Amino acid sequence: MAIPKHFDRSILISHLHDQFWSQEYYLAANKLKDWKATKGTGWAKDLFRKIDEVDSDVTQEKREVLETNASRRLIKSYFRKTQQFCSRGFLERGDLSEHLAMPQRLSMLFEIIEVFEYAREPDYNREMFDFYDDLHRVQLFRPGR
């Protein structure tokens, strides 16, 4: 797909910025941080084990599992979408490092989302995580590196 000659990236950056700073993102991030903080070692694998146990009888614990997984998927989708816009030429790497993927935001990606990916499948696709790692390599702690 050809990018229009006068494509204005600022509209796309503004939209993505609004997503990353939304109440929805904030609530999802807090849900994931709470899960990690309260589930002890094995917190990432525990989510997927409990997802497999969910049936039609939805208890408070099962609801928490489903909400936590929805939060994981939402945040991962924001990062994936932003990375794809960059890799397809709609955004430049500088747009991400300056506006959308500051080091403090990437800690959620590396310290929680990537750990979930590894727990689900040790041979997970690292492309998106490597992409963001390259933006701020020196400044970030990445357990999966």
Question: What kind of feature is each model-predicted range?
Answer:
Residues M1-R49:
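Membrane-proximal alpha-helical anchors
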Residues W35-K39, S56-V65:
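Intrinsically disordered, low-complexity coil segments
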Residues W43-E61:
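Aromatic- and Gly/Pro-rich amphipathic surface segment
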Residues Q60-R145:
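An amphipathic alpha-helical interaction surface
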